Design a protein with these regions (language model features):
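Repeated scaffold domains used in trafficking and secretory/extracellular systems
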Residues: 1-4, 32-43, 77-87, 128-145, ...
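Non-cytosolic head/periplasmic domains of membrane-anchored proteins
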Residues: 1-98
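Short loop/turn segments that connect beta-strands within beta-propeller blades
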Residues: 20-23, 61-65, 116-119, 161-164, ...
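Solenoidal tandem-repeat scaffolds enriched in leucines and small polar residues
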Residues: 53-151
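Hydrophilic extracytoplasmic domains
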Residues: 191-286
Length: 286
């Protein structure tokens, strides 16, 4: 989801649906099975496709009256590696991909940057790349039109200037990253001590790498998301909401297992989703 647009892909199938809430939506038909899809804020969609010995990342404009396929980025798995993750910039002009190349006794991970402006066209859309050695890349995600986060098991890098990508912020942690959440202007990491799964520390940074908060937490959770000034932890039947100033807002154990909790425009009302229902819940004010 990005802006007013959301993409829904038939994974292993050959259809991707794009909606903006204003019409019935449009459909992209692919020639190969779909692995994953990401959408930009104007409806341009990046779809990773699976072939027998290769992967193809296609960029489509499903609202175009002409040819909807804008760019095709092929990847040979045996030569360039297996794709781990990818993202498309909110403006639809850049894509970042992460790959793992397996050797006989070790592996290497790397990221590649593609740009679809006149600069990228001069270079067959590939405008840069970087190796992360044997650090496993967990996530690549655009944090603005021109900045992308690359997170690995021991830290992260933020690259800027997507026409000529370069590292603008970099940080390494002594502990392993358990979870990562990206907000509008902040990054939240839960770090875990090796050999002590119960020792968890939440670190909050701005996009320039300045630490905004550090706090030990003891939540049992499976998923962490950040919305505005709140971080929502969910897992099995529990939900914890922590404000970015370090104060707990909500701590509750539900009777049923929950899949997700989302905020609404009303700061005390949330949308709760479980396996069979979608409902509104209102927090009690103290």
């Amino acid at each position: 989801m990005c802006g007013d647009y959301v993409s829904v892909a038939d994974v292993s199938g050959k259809q991707c649906y794009i909606y903006n809430g204003k019409d019935e939506g449009v459909t992209v038909e692919t020639s190969l099975p779909i692995v994953r899809a990401k959408v930009a804020r104007q409806g341009v969609v990046a779809i990773l496709l699976q072939d027998k010995d290769s992967n193809v990342l296609n960029i489509y404009n499903p609202y175009s009256n002409a040819e909807s396929l804008l760019v095709e980025i092929p990847t040979n798995v045996s030569e360039e590696g297996y794709p781990l993750d990818f993202d498309i910039s909110p403006d639809g002009k850049s894509v970042v991909t992460s790959y793992m190349i397996a050797g006989s006794s070790d592996f290497e991970t790397k990221v590649s940057f593609y740009n679809f402006t006149e600069v990228g066209q001069d270079k067959n859309t590939l405008v840069g790349g970087k190796s992360f050695g044997n650090k496993m890349i967990a996530d690549v995600e655009f944090v603005s039109d021109d900045e992308v986060l690359v997170a690995h098991e021991k830290g992260y890098s933020i690259f800027g200037q997507m026409k000529q990508p370069e590292v603008v912020t970099e940080k390494t942690f002594s502990d392993s990253i358990k979870s990562l959440a990206v907000g509008d202007d902040a990054l939240a990491f839960v770090l875990q001590k090796e050999g002590n799964a119960k020792k968890q520390t939440l670190n909050l940074y701005n996009l320039s790498g300045r630490e905004k908060m550090q706090q030990d937490i003891s939540y049992e959770y499976a998923d962490m998301e950040m919305y505005g000034d709140e971080i929502i932890f969910t897992g099995n039947r529990s939900c914890n909401i922590l404000r970015t100033n370090g104060h707990d807002k909500f701590d509750y154990h539900f009777e049923q297992e929950i899949d997700a909790v989302y905020p609404t425009s009303d700061g005390q009302v949330y949308t709760l989703i479980d396996s069979s229902t979608i409902q509104k819940i209102q927090l009690q004010t103290k």
